[in-house]
């Protein structure tokens, strides 16, 4: 039987488990600590492109975040003028994989292996703002203060740490997430590339306060390349 995630209360004393910046953030992000889920389901709409100057494709997606372990599953349906693509990006127990299919049947892209696992673990870390209960309940996370408005969160993948930097604004909300090295596929070659995401428009959805808009991109030699933009349409705290 899986243990229930740890409880946390905004009325409790500051926790030594994570930095003060994170503790203050949680006090706003989880207004009702009595609702403790096993996982958080986020529904998104947005657009994504594969290369600078490339055509944007609209998508609708659901993403499940585990609260007690570093694990997620993102399932998306992309629509374009000539085709429909489905994508599954997921990570659990140190293993990650990405699958893209045409019409949900014909495989057109796959990725896996150690580099993919590290990149997907970083994705989980960078999206903790959509599952704040995982900050409290996930024992696989480690925290380090980087400055007055920044922390680092890390986890282990195959015995080696992976980390993401989280920056907060003057109000105490998360504003950006970043890493100097995240795996980017260039053809069939994995290249470590600087990566960053920005979030905004905080609102309470499904009982938690989250950023409802986000965009992410690579920091390329020619300048930033934003490849994903999306907004949250629904959040469910689930115990199934």
Set out the residue ranges of the language-model regions.
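N-terminal mature ectodomain segment of secretory-pathway/periplasmic proteins
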Residues: 24-105
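N-terminal leader/targeting segments and the immediate start of mature chains
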Residues: 1-41
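Short, solvent-exposed coil/turn segments at beta-strand boundaries
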Residues: 37, 62-75, 86-99, 146-149, ...
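N-terminal trafficking/processing presequences and adjacent post-cleavage segments
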Residues: 1-12, 95-113
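Short, solvent-exposed aromatic-acidic interface loops
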Residues: 77-83, 101-107, 180-184, 216-221
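Short, solvent-exposed secondary-structure boundary motifs
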Residues: 48-59, 73-82, 125-138, 153-159, ...
